């Protein structure tokens, strides 16, 4: 049976992960949350008292505490570093505010991109991140670049944090997201940008179902060829 690689990129809180999970489940594909991998690397640095710019020591930690994924009894994604479940801790504000610095480190990116590409060899996959269509899966048959206003993305993150019991301030989130956009778009290594052959879709005011429908239709067009 024909299967394809689907790359979904976009800035923070543009809806990538939520949509990617649903599409992967609907197609019976593997879903890989690359953002969780960079968050895990950031978490390792912070909890081990290592500077978030010390790429050699962070890469050593990644070898010592490998990142892996699992599922709970409800099918929800779990993230581990070594044997530690870090599913919730990696969403902490301290991790969020430092992950761009870690994601900009060439050696860390090289290590995690290699791992991501290895996982993608298994067959049909939906991967989301910042550089999937440009660096990780440049040959992906379907590349989507999701965008949304800062205001809408801050509101989404606010709701997510509230549901997780993380105390947050909406105005602060707007500032943090705008700052992260700048860092992600202007870093030297693998900056956030749409691939030349990506389809850009503005999710502002669009429901999750609407975004899933749009991407699913594009995938079906390719699979039906």
UniProtKB/Swiss-Prot annotation:
Enzyme Commission code: 2.7.4.25
Lineage, uppermost ranks: Bacteria, Bacillati, Bacillota, Bacilli, Lactobacillales
Family listed: Belongs to the cytidylate kinase family. Type 1 subfamily.
Pfam family, one: Cytidylate_kin
Compartment list: Cytoplasm
Keywords: ATP-binding, Cytoplasm, Kinase, Nucleotide-binding, Transferase
Annotated catalysed reactions: CMP + ATP = CDP + ADP; dCMP + ATP = dCDP + ADP
The organism of origin for this protein: Streptococcus suis (strain 05ZYH33)
Annotated protein name in UniProt: Cytidylate kinase
Primary subcellular site in the record, as a coarse category: cytoplasm
Keyword Membrane: no
GO biological process, alphabetically ordered: nucleobase-containing small molecule interconversion; pyrimidine nucleotide metabolic process
EC category name: transferase
Domain of life: Bacteria
Stored NCBIfam families: cmk
InterPro entries named in the record: Cytidylate_kin, Cytidylate_kinase_dom, P-loop_NTPase
Cellular component, GO, one term: cytosol
Binding site for ATP: 10-18
